[in-house]
Amino acid sequence: MVDIIFNSSFLGDMGDHSKKKSGIAMCVGCGSQIHDQYILRVAPDLEWHAACLKCAECSQYLDETCTCFVRDGKTYCKRDYVRLFGIKCANCNIGFCSSDLVMRARDNVYHMECFRCSVCSRHLLPGDEFSLRDEELLCRADHGLLMEQASAGSPLSPGIIHSRSLHIADPVSVRQPPHRNHVHKQSEKTTRVRTVLNEKQLHTLRTCYNANPRPDALMKEQLVEMTGLSPRVIRVWFQNKRCKDKKRSIFMKQLQQQHHSDKTNLQGLTGTPLVAGSPIRHDNTVQGNPVEVQTYQPPWKALSEFALQSDLDQPAFQQLVSFSESGSMGNSSGSDVTSLSSQLPDTPNSMVASPVDT
């Protein structure tokens, strides 16, 4: 694909000097001599009449405002050139926009939605393993099934494999789609083989890690000799182990804080946790000195009740006198009763009780 930038040059009075220097200008489109005042020049040295420079597909006139593409001696506008010669999706055979994200498998380019297994139509995501066979994608499961059928010598199902050879490409990882505004080719890299450690190797690495989580270069060399692993595998194992332990310690710390918060918080209230003891028998005996309680009735209350009575009988009056004598402070006698009765009003019904502070 050749990208050519369209430029227009205005010759004016310098046209004679240019003709003297470079000769007569000939149109690439029609082959005739250009006598026009303006010449459309396509880099690097192609010159055209203004009426001859147009798209070979849609006949759109090309000038300095658009991009011109030249292929096999024909000129194309950008739209037709991309449609005819641009990179297309290997699955749907549709071109790409400048803002599309693509997935690559060797020399093939796919839309994000078109990057699927050709057998089960499972969408392949970045990180999934796949194989590319006869320009068709296979997920890891279908790749393994095909390998089993090939090793067993059984005939391949025509619904799954259509005229394919038994050679299958090695599975490679899906790479992240490039965040670029244009599509271009990149060399693909296969994934590294996953290393599986046996029990003896794991025991050796864990023992060394418990003694020193960050071994020096000498210790790593000794581990290489003891385990038979590569230095890169040992370095990555220690890095992953330290990362896992750090995450585990952070998680345990958060769990302890949450557990402590749950114990001390009850319905949003913070308090001190209490522990209930064993039940004990209730003792009715009261510790302390006995207290004698006596009932005291103020004298005015008895007098008020006496005054409100309409009929006075002798026994009730004698009881009132006896109560008054018992409520006195030791100074009561027969004369006191006479003085108390003399202080009563003539009309008992006119007596009204008033509260007295005791």
Curated annotation (Swiss-Prot):
Ranges annotated as biased composition (Polar residues): 336-358
Domain LIM zinc-binding intervals: 27-80, 89-143
Pfam families referenced in this protein's UniProt entry, alphabetically: Homeodomain, LIM
Annotated region (Disordered), positions in chain: 325-358
Localisation: Nucleus
DNA-binding residues (ranges): 190-249
Location, primary (coarse class): nucleus
InterPro entries: HD, Homeobox_CS, Homeodomain-like_sf, ISL1/2-like, ISL1/2-like_LIM1, Znf_LIM
Any one biological process term the GO annotation gives: axonogenesis
Molecular function terms, GO-annotated: cis-regulatory region sequence-specific DNA binding; DNA-binding transcription factor activity, RNA polymerase II-specific; metal ion binding
Cellular component, GO, one term: nucleus
Biased composition (Low complexity): 325-335
Keyword annotations of the record: Developmental protein, DNA-binding, Homeobox, LIM domain, Metal-binding, Nucleus, Repeat, Zinc
Claim: Cytoplasm is one of the keywords in the record: no
Highest taxon listed in the record's lineage: Eukaryota
Function summary: Binds to one of the cis-acting domain of the insulin gene enhancer. May be involved in subtype specialization of primary motoneurons.
PANTHER family on file: INSULIN GENE ENHANCER PROTEIN, INSULIN GENE ENHANCER PROTEIN ISL-2
Protein name: Insulin gene enhancer protein ISL-2A
